[in-house]
């Protein structure tokens, strides 16, 4: 069972300076948001999160929101320690939880997994009358037949993280409390506002308009206050558009607003690593190393941490730095075997290590990743499509690699920083794979808007 981030809420109060307007907005939200139920005998967690790694960013934002609201949240990749018996820890975590949230989308892909998770949580709800089972749907995909007897909360308007009125409904559902008429009216108002802002942020990224992202953030409002989802989406957009200084400024404010949020720290480290000035790499590794030691070992944290070790290798040429990068990607992939991002990087770094044993390992990783991502483009998903291309590159199928890389660039033309990262990786791999000049030119054509490898 792919579950929960587990970090216990503590009594430390983060310092924050509110202006009058911000305080009024927060009080309005708190007026309608229910508090976590007191933990009873044998209970350790208010809520248990069940999910697949393909939805990890959304779940991480949900974790941040719940933790910020004072809920004790079980999330496997935080709770689990090396050597733990996975099934036993998950079973204990579920038994010790007051509620369970099943996060599902079409990208989950594995109907058998959905059925098992659904039946497990449904059984808990039948056996324990106080247990609240809350299924959550992240897109407009059709629900499986076996799930038709239960109402799913619809977060299809919030692909980047929970927000708006649906978040308020989720909080009520996991505490077993119905919405009052006033809360229902408030939730409906927030749905429209949060959806509009998310669409404006997405449009600004697509239109290469970082100034609009900054203006939207500066305007603020309740939708920016209740969840870090909008702020993180805007900051990630700035990173994609190469505005790392602005992203870091935005993330500093978000960290003060959401002091327990993990996603903001991940993005801070990513922006520092991409900026690459002076002490940036050291500071990025300090953030990520601290998260790692604190038990935050989800694929996103491990993936960015591994990336910084690759950056370090690029400067040092020290093979141990490259091995550290590959090992972190491999650790993440073994923790979440459906996470294609860490899987493809474990494969690629193994190629760069360039021994017969490592090349065999790379082939095994690449085959596993191809089972996840398939062989065709994924409309609207740059990174998954680029990963399909990278698998073909590793398999030395250069025509197919070029086709998929071109498709990836075409669906995210504004994301130049993402293109640069993908092209640099392809260059490193081709240095080891030794394609013919003709085959290299095919791959190069997809990135003709970027300088060639130095």
Language model region names:
Residues 61-92, 107-115, 154-158:
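Conserved BB-loop
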Residues 201-215, 236-249, 273-287, 317-326, ...:
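Helix-turn-helix repeat elements of alpha-solenoid scaffolds
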Residues 220-224, 258, 288, 295, ...:
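Alpha-helical junction/boundary sensor with strong preference for TPR arrays
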Residues 89-92, 96, 101-141:
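Amphipathic helical hotspot of TIR/SEFIR-family domains
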Residues 333, 347, 351, 366-368, ...:
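TPR/TPR-like (Sel1-like) alpha-helical repeat modules
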Residues 275-280, 312-318, 351-362, 398, ...:
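Alpha-helical linker/edge segments of TPR/alpha-solenoid repeat scaffolds
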Residues 189-203, 224-236, 258-275, 296-315, ...:
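Amphipathic alpha-helical repeat scaffolds of TPR domains
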Residues 1-68, 132, 137-215:
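C-terminal interaction surface of TIR/SEFIR-family domains
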């Amino acid at each position: 069972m792919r579950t929960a981030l587990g970090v216990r809420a503590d009594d430390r109060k983060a310092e924050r300076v509110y202006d009058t307007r911000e305080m009024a907005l927060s009080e309005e939200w708190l007026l309608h948001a229910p508090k976590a139920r007191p933990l009873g005998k044998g209970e350790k967690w208010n809520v248990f999160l069940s999910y697949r790694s393909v939805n990890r960013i959304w779940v991480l934002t949900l974790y941040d929101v719940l933790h910020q609201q004072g809920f004790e949240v079980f999330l496997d990749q935080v709770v689990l320690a090396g050597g733990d018996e996975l099934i036993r820890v998950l079973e204990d975590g579920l038994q010790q939880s007051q509620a369970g949230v099943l996060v599902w989308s079409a990208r989950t892909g594995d109907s058998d997994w959905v059925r098992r998770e659904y039946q497990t949580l449904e059984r808990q709800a039948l056996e324990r009358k106080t247990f609240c089972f809350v299924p959550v749907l992240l897109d407009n995909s059709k629900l499986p037949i076996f799930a038709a007897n239960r109402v799913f909360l619809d977060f299809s308007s919030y692909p980047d993280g929970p927000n708006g009125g649906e978040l308020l409904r989720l909080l009520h559902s996991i505490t077993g409390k119905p919405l009052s008429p006033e809360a229902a009216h408030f939730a409906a108002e927030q749905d429209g506002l949060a959806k509009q802002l998310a669409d404006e942020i997405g449009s600004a990224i697509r239109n290469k308009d970082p100034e609009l992202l900054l203006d939207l953030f500066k305007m603020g409002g309740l939708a920016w206050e209740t969840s870090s989802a909008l702020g993180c989406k805007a900051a990630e957009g700035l990173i994609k558009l190469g505005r790392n200084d602005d992203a870091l400024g935005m993330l500093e404010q978000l960290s003060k607003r959401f002091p327990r949020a993990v996603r903001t720290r991940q993005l801070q480290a990513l922006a520092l690593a991409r900026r690459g000035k002076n002490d940036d790499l050291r500071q990025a590794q300090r953030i990520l190393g601290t998260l790692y030691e604190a038990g935050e070992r989800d694929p996103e944290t491990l993936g960015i941490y591994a990336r910084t070790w690759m950056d370090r290798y690029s400067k040092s040429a020290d093979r141990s730095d490259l091995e550290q990068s590959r090992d972190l990607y491999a650790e993440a992939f073994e923790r979440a075997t459906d996470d294609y991002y860490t899987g493809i990087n474990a494969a690629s770094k193994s190629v760069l290590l360039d021994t017969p044993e490592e090349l065999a390992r790379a082939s095994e990783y690449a085959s596993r990743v191809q089972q996840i991502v398939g062989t065709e483009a994924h409309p609207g998903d740059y990174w998954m499509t680029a990963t399909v291309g990278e698998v073909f590159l590793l398999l030395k199928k250069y025509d197919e690699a070029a086709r998929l890389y071109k498709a990836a660039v075409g669906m995210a033309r504004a994301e130049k920083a993402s293109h640069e990262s993908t092209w640099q990786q392809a260059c490193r791999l081709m240095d080891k794979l030794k394609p013919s000049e003709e085959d290299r030119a095919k791959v190069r054509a997809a990135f003709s808007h970027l300088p060639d490898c130095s």
